[in-house]
Regions:
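Glycosyltransferase catalytic domains, chiefly GT-A lineage
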Residues: 1-135
């Protein structure tokens, strides 16, 4: 990452997204997902939204924290074996350092209720997963 932010800047709870590459469909999915989270958020202070991306300019003016990722970082996160989904685990590892509670959100997630409710289900002994996927 090219930007370092401490926990007090992000806040106690965050939704964390990872977006990279040039496929417009993923960028549009991320925007729709973020908009759905913002639409259903009842209290502004309940959580923040953090996006790690190599396309920070696509989110200029959005009410989220955008952390710019370099090609070098994305390459390191992919690892020597070239496994692109390893980047997700690396983003989560980096992201959990930014807030008290972090929930990683895939770009194709759409919220129909206040995402703040999810943080009540996350504890030191309890994690949250929407769907286990093998890929």
């Amino acid at each position: 990452m090219t930007q370092h932010i401490n926990r007090s800047v992000i806040g106690p709870h965050q939704l964390l997204y990872l977006l990279y590459g040039d496929k417009e469909v993923y960028r549009l999915e991320a925007k729709f997902s973020i908009l759905s989270a913002l639409r259903h958020r009842k209290n502004l202070a309940d959580f923040t939204i953090t996006l790690m991306t190599d396309q920070p300019e696509a989110f200029d003016g959005w009410p989220i924290t955008v952390l710019s990722l370099s090609e070098e970082t994305l390459g390191i996160w992919q690892g020597a074996g070239g496994y692109s989904h390893r980047r997700k685990a690396c983003a989560i590892q980096a992201g959990v350092m930014l807030a008290g509670k972090t929930i990683f959100i895939d770009t194709d997630t759409v919220f129909f209720k206040d995402p703040a409710l999810l943080f009540q289900r996350v504890t030191d002994d309890q994690f949250l997963m929407d769907e286990f996927e093998l890929s």
